[in-house]
């Protein structure tokens, strides 16, 4: 790949940060430490590139990132004037943690990742950053950390997993979650239940549908912070290896031209990112994370920007969880660049936004494949969309005065009026499924699991999957002050602000109340008289904090509401 910059090129020191340590004659101990890690005399004038991966053995999404990081380091070291230094930060496997209290740490991990990247690179004076994320919160955490530093940076996505298979049926992580509901209702044998679990995840790579990881990778490539094809190159592919081999030249180009995240992550670039999320039918988590990434670079993006773009952007991608296809299928027809090329042709994107190649978004995709709408139905044309407007809708009303996020594919309808069934937490809901407490026409209300009340705003993938598996996915709705996995589908509303423990009306809902959700008029309302609401509020007792020490308590104290991205950056 060729790299270029259309702006004015000025002479610049590539090591303008690291020279603070390597060239200062009053820092002999610093320089001795560098000799200790193997530096030669000639290395002290090189620009230092920090290569951070979220590699660890315990998650298929992340188990290969160390290998990719080593390839990137080799690419950097083979590039004249650069030296690569690897470091690592943490991750949380949403697929493993979902359904248990450990899921409270997932969103928190985004902030820990951002803080640790900023901390390490800031302390070590790295001149540039390459981040290698895999699982969901890894991506926004990486971008937030790089945005705070505002030094030349590139994100290399770890890549998507291949599909699993059992008895001729293609499987993915959500297949395993939904098998629970089938088991509870007696709709799957023990043998097949075990068979699904054993075969859903065949190896390394992020969960394969248009779930949160692939959604965020697509958004960040469109934003301009990854090389073209990074989002759709599979974890196990020659293309992903080739991408790693290109990073040395790519990051040197950014250093030479002093192209920083602030040059790339503009308001228009974020609008492009939101557009691709809508077109691909992406995760509700994109709302939280794009708002947070924009905040880190000083660009104001709100929930209302999502609604504005949703109103004029159709869903074209037929991807799981609500559709048929996986990210590996998009890769076969040209990946994200093919979709971007089509959208640019149709006037749906800002083509003049700068990217990490030094080229504009439009220049990046000039040679991408053209989508053939006769030979594939993974991506539909604008004139034949899956849904005429975006699937992510921002709803307001007395249940969500600060807003909420609905994921409405259109397959489940756009209006739901039903009877409330209240659950104080995730396990309470699962118990309700097992006891037959939920029936067609009900609105499940799961509360006290928001950013403060959770704390950590855990995902409700286990409940929504159990609902689908139990055969209630098309006849029940679910609302929560928590959030959803990218694997969630059905009539669901999350991110309700204010959350229950912050005085939100969701904390006052009782069984048999009537709740109305209108995705056409963007409203969510509790149909209870004002005097009855006042009576309940007078008698309300706020639950005691679930965490009083440690990182969860810290998050609960610092976090902004979901409508502001749950950022903790003061």
From Swiss-Prot:
Q: What does the record's cofactor remark say about binding?
A: Binds 1 [2Fe-2S] cluster per subunit. This cluster acts as a Lewis acid cofactor.
Q: What is its EC number?
A: 4.2.1.9
Cofactor(s) the protein needs: [2Fe-2S] cluster; Mg(2+)
Residues found modified as N6-carboxylysine: 137
> Where does the record place the catalytic residues?
485 (proton acceptor)
GO MF:
2 iron, 2 sulfur cluster binding; dihydroxy-acid dehydratase activity; magnesium ion binding
The Gene Ontology biological process annotation of the record reads: isoleucine biosynthetic process; L-valine biosynthetic process
- Reading the lineage from the top rank, the first entry is Bacteria
Q: Which sites bind [2Fe-2S] cluster?
A: 61, 135, 207
Which Gene3D superfamilies does UniProt cross-reference here?
Answer: IlvD/EDD C-terminal domain-like
Pathway(s) served: Amino-acid biosynthesis; L-isoleucine biosynthesis; L-isoleucine from 2-oxobutanoate: step 3/4; Amino-acid biosynthesis; L-valine biosynthesis; L-valine from pyruvate: step 3/4
**Alphabetized UniProt keyword annotations:** 2Fe-2S, Amino-acid biosynthesis, Branched-chain amino acid biosynthesis, Iron, Iron-sulfur, Lyase, Magnesium, Metal-binding
Per the entry, what this protein does is: Functions in the biosynthesis of branched-chain amino acids. Catalyzes the dehydration of (2R,3R)-2,3-dihydroxy-3-methylpentanoate (2,3-dihydroxy-3-methylvalerate) into 2-oxo-3-methylpentanoate (2-oxo-3-methylvalerate) and of (2R)-2,3-dihydroxy-3-methylbutanoate (2,3-dihydroxyisovalerate) into 2-oxo-3-methylbutanoate (2-oxoisovalerate), the penultimate precursor to L-isoleucine and L-valine, respectively.
Q: State the similarity comment.
A: Belongs to the IlvD/Edd family.
HAMAP family for the chain: IlvD
User: What is the name attached to this protein's record?
Assistant: Dihydroxy-acid dehydratase
In which organism is this protein found?
Lactococcus lactis subsp. cremoris (strain SK11)
């Amino acid at each position: 790949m060729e790299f270029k910059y259309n702006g004015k090129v000025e002479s610049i020191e590539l090591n303008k940060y690291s020279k603070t340590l390597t060239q200062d004659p009053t820092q002999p101990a610093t320089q001795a430490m560098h000799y200790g890690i193997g530096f030669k005399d000639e290395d002290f004038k090189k620009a230092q590139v920090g290569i951070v991966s979220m590699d660890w053995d315990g998650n298929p999404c992340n188990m290969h990132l160390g290998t990719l990081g080593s390839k990137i380091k080799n690419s950097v070291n083979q590039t004249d004037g650069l030296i690569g230094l690897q470091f690592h930060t943490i991750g949380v496997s949403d697929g493993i943690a979902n359904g248990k209290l450990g899921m409270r740490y997932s969103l928190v991990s985004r902030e820990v990742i951002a803080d640790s990247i900023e901390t390490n690179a800031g302390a070590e004076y790295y001149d540039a950053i390459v981040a290698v994320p895999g699982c969901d919160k890894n991506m926004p955490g990486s971008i937030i950390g790089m945005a705070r530093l505002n030094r030349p940076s590139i994100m290399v996505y770890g890549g998507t997993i291949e599909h699993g298979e059992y008895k001729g049926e293609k499987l993915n992580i959500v297949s395993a979650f939904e098998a629970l509901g089938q088991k509870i209702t007696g709709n799957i044998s023990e043998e097949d239940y075990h068979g699904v679990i054993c075969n859903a995840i065949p190896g390394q790579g992020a969960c394969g549908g248009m779930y949160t990881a692939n959604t965020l990778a697509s958004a960040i490539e469109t934003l301009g912070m990854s090389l073209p094809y990074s989002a759709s190159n599979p974890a196990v592919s020659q293309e992903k290896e080739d991408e790693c081999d290109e990073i040395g030249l790519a990051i040197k180009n950014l250093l030479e031209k002093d192209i920083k995240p602030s040059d790339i992550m503009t308001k228009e670039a974020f609008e492009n990112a939101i557009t691709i999320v809508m077109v691909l039918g992406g995760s509700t988590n994109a709302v939280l994370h794009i708002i947070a990434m924009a905040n880190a670079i000083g660009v104001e993006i709100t929930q209302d920007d999502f609604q504005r773009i949703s109103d004029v952007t159709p869903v074209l991608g037929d991807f799981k969880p609500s559709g048929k296809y996986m990210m590996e299928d998009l890769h076969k027809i040209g990946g994200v660049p093919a979709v971007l090329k089509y959208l640019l042709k149709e006037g749906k994107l800002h083509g003049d936004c700068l990217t990490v190649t030094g080229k504009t978004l439009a220049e990046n995709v000039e040679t991408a494949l053209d989508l053939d709408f006769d030979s594939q139905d993974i991506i539909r044309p604008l004139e034949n969309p899956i849904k005429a407007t975006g699937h992510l809708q921002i709803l307001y009303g007395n249940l969500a005065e600060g807003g909420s996020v609905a994921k409405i594919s259109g397959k489940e309808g756009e209006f739901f009026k039903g009877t409330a069934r209240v659950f104080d937490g995730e396990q309470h809901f699962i118990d309700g499924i097992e006891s037959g407490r939920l029936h067609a026409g009900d609105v499940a209300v799961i509360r006290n699991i928001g950013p403060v009340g959770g704390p950590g705003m855990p995902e409700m993938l286990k409940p929504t999957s159990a609902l689908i598996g139990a055969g209630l996915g098309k006849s029940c709705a679910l609302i929560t002050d928590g959030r959803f996995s990218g694997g969630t589908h059905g009539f669901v509303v999350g991110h309700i602000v204010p959350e229950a423990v912050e005085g939100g009306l969701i904390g006052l809902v009782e069984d048999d109340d009537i709740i109305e959700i209108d995705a056409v008029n963007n409203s969510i309302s509790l149909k209870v008289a004002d005097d009855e609401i006042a009576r309940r509020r007078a008698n309300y007792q706020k639950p005691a904090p679930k965490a009083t020490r440690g990182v969860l308590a810290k998050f609960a104290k610092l976090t902004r509401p979901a409508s502001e991205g749950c950022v903790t950056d003061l």
